[in-house]
């Protein structure tokens, strides 16, 4: 009989659930976070159970993580986002030593040792610039969807518009001015991605970047931001195996840690 564990990651903008079945990744679920994190966690969990065709009693252990981890009322325990992302990234990409997690409302840089233990971390949670919310905000200003940003970035020659401000409020004014000056949308998007990369790269360099580097969070799906980060860091960012959603890394890590804790408590080896 398979040993199934679950990880629930309640983030600021999205909530995720992942199942770990024996030594492999099982079904995953993702949806928007709401003002009722308890209900959101339950809904996300039930969705992934339904996809797997199992019941709650079939899951040996559940761990919560993310901003809303304390609201995962059915969890056996919870862990920090740092530990969850560290474990998730390491199990998916064993060579990973630095994680750049660009979330909805903050950016984290996590440095790990060869075993995946967190050595150091840094966070930018004081300003929206350099986060997923910033990209959402500017995309709305431009009248496009977030999913269109990467395509726009690659749709023209590389001529990023200059955005002098590092504040999201002032950048909005700059973007509006650029639109009024009829600067091509692709160049504005390139400039916006460059602005995000400058802020994130500055944090990463302060931390003392160690390769291999991997990006997690929803912004990791934006090839334009990844391209700009590689330019600013001067390295090639690694990617997870095909089919693995970079937004799921925290939930996956929580599920793996849940398995390890369950085996330890039951006197078995992980």
Mark where each language-model region is.
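Adenine-nucleotide phosphate-binding core of ATP-dependent small-molecule kinases
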Residues: 171-204, 247
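Glycine-rich phosphate-binding loop plus the immediately following alpha-helix
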Residues: 114-155, 256, 260
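Glycine-rich phosphate-binding/hydrolytic loop that grips phosphoryl groups
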Residues: 132-136, 242-270
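Short beta-strand-loop/turn "lid" adjacent to the catalytic site in phosphate-handling enzymes
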Residues: 21, 27-33, 52-83, 110, ...
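Gly/Thr-rich phosphate-binding beta-strand-loop-beta motif of the actin/hexokinase/Hsp70
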Residues: 1-24, 97-116, 158-161
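Conserved phosphate-binding/catalytic loops in two-lobed NTP-binding clefts
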Residues: 81-82, 230-252
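Glycine-rich phosphate-binding loops at beta-strand->alpha-helix junctions
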Residues: 67, 209-232, 244-247
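Short glycine-rich, Thr/Ser-proximal phosphate-binding strand/loop in the N-terminal lobe
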Residues: 4-39, 43, 47, 118-126
